[in-house]
Amino acid sequence: MILTVTMNPSIDISYPLDVFKMDTVNRVAEVSKTAGGKGLNVTRVLAEIGDNVAATGLIGGTNGHFLLQHLPQNIQAFFYEIAGDTRNCIAILHEGQQTEILEAGPTIAAEEVNGFLHHYRSLMGATDVVAISGSLPAGLPTEFYVQLVEIAHQFGNKVVLDCSGVALQAALGSPVKPTAIKPNNEELSQLLGREVSKDLNELKEVLSEPLFEGIEWIIVSLGADGAFAKHWDTFYKVDIPKIEVVNPVGSGDSTVAGISSALSHQVDDYSLLKKANVLGMLNAQEKMTGHVNVSKYDNLYNQITVKEV
């Protein structure tokens, strides 16, 4: 089973408007509300491609119950309930633009942190891959994801970690490493304190730095240029076909789903990289975030090339 972890989920609310007027009333004809969070996007995609997937994380209040009710029926939900209310994230779509209002989310009490860790540990026996995604809510220490990685490894489980900032820095600085990470160029630049380009030789040097030592898989998205990857000491370049992008939001999460699925099925390097990239591309072709059209999978998969460099 693949277990996804979303520590700071949300109810994603979308308000489409022809014109957004400041300092007055704006009336909305239709509202879209979905269970949101990077980990839940991963969960939905894994369910759509037929993997055995379960979701955990923190939920609370009426929003938490709404989130549970709006998960697909074929997803096992093992969320841990907290006192605070799950946050709202509002997107106002207007004049071809998007204005976002993001709540910070609840502050997690110390006893809730300990309670979740005990709950998380109880799920490890039925799990083979853990996919951890997104930001940490207030109250959780910056090294919290390190604790989750360590517990997973105690049970022999692989971990795909998709986070940024201090949480990622803490994970990279720990002696306990995730199995796979997928930073982009911007995140690499932030980690190293210098500009990192898409030049393959530079990426080879960057991913060979001591900061990344001990991580089995590092997959760097290059957008329309595909991806660059390192598996232990072997480097790969992934080339992808041109596609019509409808909505790129959630493509990184879909890539995480592909990595997690491939690790669970223990496929070879080439198959892992193709699966990760095809799911990211399929998501970008859809209006809905965290959704893929599996009927297009094989055709697109066969157009992706992977070569050792």
Swiss-Prot record:
GO biological process, alphabetically ordered: D-tagatose 6-phosphate catabolic process; lactose catabolic process via tagatose-6-phosphate
Reactions catalysed, as given in the entry: D-tagatofuranose 6-phosphate + ATP = D-tagatofuranose 1,6-bisphosphate + ADP + H(+)
EC annotation from Swiss-Prot or TrEMBL: 2.7.1.144
InterPro entries (alphabetical): Carboh/pur_kinase_PfkB_CS (IPR002173), LacC (IPR005926), PfkB_dom (IPR011611), Ribokinase-like (IPR029056), Tagatose/fructose_Pkinase (IPR017583)
HAMAP family: LacC (MF_01557)
Similarity comment: family membership: Belongs to the carbohydrate kinase PfkB family. LacC subfamily.
Name used for this protein in its record: Tagatose-6-phosphate kinase 1
Record organism: Streptococcus agalactiae serotype III (strain NEM316)
Designated gene of the protein: lacC1
